[in-house]
Amino acid sequence: MTDQNPFLALKEEMDKLVIGHEGVKISLLLGIISREHIYIEGPPGTAKTMLAEIISSAAQLHFFFYQLHRDTRLSELIGDLIISKEPSESGELIKQKIIKGGILTSEICLLDDISRAPGESLNVLLRILNERKFFNESIPLLTAIATSNPTADEYYNEPLDPANLDRFVIQVIAKGLSYGREWKQAREVIRLYSERPLEYEVPERVTKEILDEYYKKLASLEIPPEVQEALANFVATLIEDYGLNETNSLISDRTFFVKALKILRAHALLNDRDKCALEDLFAMKYITAFRLPEEIFMKLDEIISDIISQKKNKKISQAK
């Protein structure tokens, strides 16, 4: 175990086995801290599953993995369905019982190829994830990680409906090192896997109790007025200066004025701060990958940097 920031300990374990993919790593950590669900889109072989498994092992969390397909049945996701016959006064009574498993008993679940799930199963699945309940009974799930291949024709993949995609607060794009031309990191991967043993057991670094303690801290973490104003300015800038509207983006009040506050706080905790700072506005990169047009998303660092600079310059002017 460790007395250091528990989330940095989890990051260390991911870094030991996976080179690069910083956006995915930070997204997973923000999801664990905030207990919000995560959507990752990227081609096969970009460490999506491996990173989720590393976090669950290092944090001693019960992990469930399932690869969805066109014939996925709900029972495959929630446990075994037992059907029995019992005699009754009016004849034979047929009863069904669910022996809980899958997402009903896991603390982290990874739902691979979620967009391939049939509509009926997907709707029930998303309702369970949203409510974190099954027949009014709470489930222990901290965060669900849904993955999908890019929706290009060659992957024979259909995109999630925007309303369904919006249920995943954290959204990130995973890219391979080769096509991303990250040649230095590619060489590091080759070196790492040339030297590491074939079998490697991820050590236990964090307990569920520690994660619970930090989640309690999350709600009380201060968001100063200047950070609140910066968030409002961020949304206003996207709409007023970049022409975003209902037809070209998905900027919901729920996501940007409620859920975004949890992500700001989670980002502050990840960086060992006891209150949010203007720099935590960069966490908005992890909720906007599929809510904004690609060309606007690519400018996000610049947009956020400008907003932070304006706030800091205003503060300096007022102090004079």
Protein language model regions, located:
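Canonical AAA+ ATPase core
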Residues: 84-89, 108, 113-124, 130-206, ...
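Pre-Walker A (pre-P-loop) alpha-helix and adjacent loop at the N terminus of AAA/AAA+ ATPase modules
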Residues: 4-43
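Conserved C-terminal "switch" segment of AAA+ ATPases
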Residues: 3, 17-18, 172-246, 273
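Conserved alpha-helical scaffold flanking the Walker A/P-loop in AAA+ ATPase domains
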Residues: 27-30, 83-109
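Short loop/turn elements that form and flank the Walker-type P-loop nucleotide-binding site
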Residues: 26, 33-35, 59, 103-105, ...
